[in-house]
């Protein structure tokens, strides 16, 4: 996000056109893809996502996934001609596209196309590339059972063979040299993304509406159990810390890695609990569902939204946004939390809304206002949220109002649809 959105937009479009000319040759879609072409297509999708062109990013990501599948990146490499570092690079490319498709699918509400049943690509080893020459790391990269035994200590479920009693000493040696780093962060992020995809498939597929209330409750309970398991396995260096205690303190993260994982975790929690927010989906007293369950899960959803916003600084901080936060999807996180609060407020009676929720909505509105000044996609989101807030003025009053001069005209904000 840049202070002058018009100038920044012109510059980024210029860079994008150059990248497109260089990377997407006239026959790029007809030629057999190679690893470099897959990376180019994936980077173009990320670039479009960062610009706010989510629909275009979703389409290009689909092309990249097709190219990767054509290369067999969705399968574990058994080739003797591919070096171990090259295999790890291919694994990272595949899981990067996997996470990117999940993010874009959640943003657009479109179905996810990758089927886990057709994927045997193992998660990459949680070590930096400069450690690939160490004996223990080489052993883990070579032996898939040892790899899974190691990963079982930091993720909920490895890919491929389930962990079994193996070389315990190798795993212990590897754990001794395993430190929080970008590779370990990526493994934890992918593991959480896999849970998020399961949540989408079990709770948001159109055919799910045919399931009974008990089936929905079981799916939601299972999803939250998996999220809690993921959180319990998260390495200590990536965990968020609560200051103040008693469940009412502010949340503090150590660095960009822990902040990104925390935001992703609360986003997944919102996805798992959000079905219970909708008033008309709650079972009546005569149905088989338990209304107390829906009330509890709905409260958990609102709490996750408040916790997500609690990770933001009290006042808008452009430096924090660009240098610490995962800026490429911060608008999504902000709007996701705001939407939860707006839905909850629409179902509440005036005067019954907790003060903490109102403060969270005020904070979200303040951040959207400031982001709208420097980013056109944020400006459009600010217009939409402002219109919804206006309809809820009888419930929340003007405390969370969005300043009209900060959002711009509707014709201007349509650029990033």
Predicted regions and their residues:
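Extended, leucine-rich alpha-helical cores of fungal transcription factors
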Residues: 1-122, 126, 174-229, 233, ...
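C-terminal, low-complexity intrinsically disordered regions in eukaryotic proteins
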Residues: 127, 136-172, 222, 286, ...
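Conserved, structured regulatory domains from eukaryotic proteins
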Residues: 129-131
